[in-house]
Amino acid sequence: MTERIFRYLREQQPETPCLVIDLDVVENNFRRMRELLPAAHIFYAVKANPAAQILARLANLGSKFDTASRGEIEMVQQTGVSMDRVSFGNTIKKEKDIAWAYQQGVRLFAFDSEAELQKLARVAPGARVFCRVLVDCGGAEWPLSKKFGCAPEMAKDLLRKAKDWGLDAYGISFHVGSQQTDLEQWDRALAQVSQMFFALAEAGVDLRMVNLGGGFPARYRAEVSSIDAYCEAVGRALVRHFGNRMPEVIMEPGRSMVGDAGVIQSEVVLVSRKAANDRKRWVYLDIGKFSG
C-alpha cells in the first residue's frame, strides 16, 4: 500500500468495500516497461482494470490498448485516443462487433480459426490480422493453453489464407499464461514463432509483427521476479531468435501494470462457527459476491 492510498483511506474513511488505485504507480509501471523494452509497443490489456482514470492516464502517456469487446473499445474511445491505437485482441468476436469496430477505425484484429478469419475477410477488408498460436504455459498460475490459439501448422495455413483473402497477414501472437513465473517461457515461445516467420517468408507471406501477449506477473503476497528481469529475458530471447530480422514487437501487460497499484478495503461483517464444538471460524466480508 502506498502512502497516498493509506492517507486517503485514513482521511476520507470511505464506505466499504472500496477500491483505491494510486495512478502514479500505474504510470511508473508503464514508464519502466517502456524504458526496458523501448522498441515494443505497449498495448494495455483493458480487461485488467477498465477504470476511466487508468485509461486516461495511460492514454496521455502514449499507451495503446488491447481490447476484448465492443464495450472495452467504447471505454477507450472516451479517452479520445485514435482507433489506430487499439487492437481487437479477442479471437472470438461477433461479426457485427468486428464490423462496428472497423467502422470506428480499428484496423488490428486477432484470430485463431478459419471461421473467425472468414468474418474478418467479410467485414474488415484490408485489416491487419495476427494469428494466436498455442504455446507451453507451464509455470503460469492461470494457463491459457487450450481455450485460445491454434496449432502452429494451422496458424501458418490460416496466415496464407489471410493474404489470399485480402487481409494484411501482419503477425503472430501468443500468451504464456497469466502470472507466469518461468522467465524462459517467452524464449521457448519465440523459438517456435521465429521458425514460423521464416517458413512463411519462404512461402511468400512476409509477417512483420510478433505479439508477446501478457503474462508478466503482479506482486501480491508471493514474491515474483522483477519486471526488469522479465523484460531483460524477453529482450534476450528476441535477439536470440530473430537477430537482425527483428519484427515489430507488441506486448499486452495487464495485471503487471495495475495489480500492485491498488488496495481493496473491506469490513468484517460476521465471524461465526457452524457447531458448538467446531473449532473453525467462518469470517464473512462485505465484499463477497453473495454479500458474505
Question: What positions do the PLM features span?
Answer:
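Structural preference for beta-strand elements that scaffold enzyme active sites
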Residues: 41-43, 64, 83-87, 108, ...
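Alpha-helix N-cap and loop-to-helix initiation/capping positions
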Residues: 21, 93, 115, 143-154, ...
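C-terminal active-site-proximal or functional interface alpha/beta core segments in diverse enzymes
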Residues: 185-292
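Active-site-proximal beta-alpha loop/turn segments in soluble metabolic enzymes
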Residues: 55, 102, 134-147, 171-185, ...
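Conserved anion-binding
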Residues: 112-168
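Active-site-proximal loop/turn and secondary-structure-junction residues that shape catalytic pockets
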Residues: 25, 48-50, 71-72, 92-94, ...
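A charged N-terminal "starter" segment
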Residues: 1-127, 164, 168, 202, ...
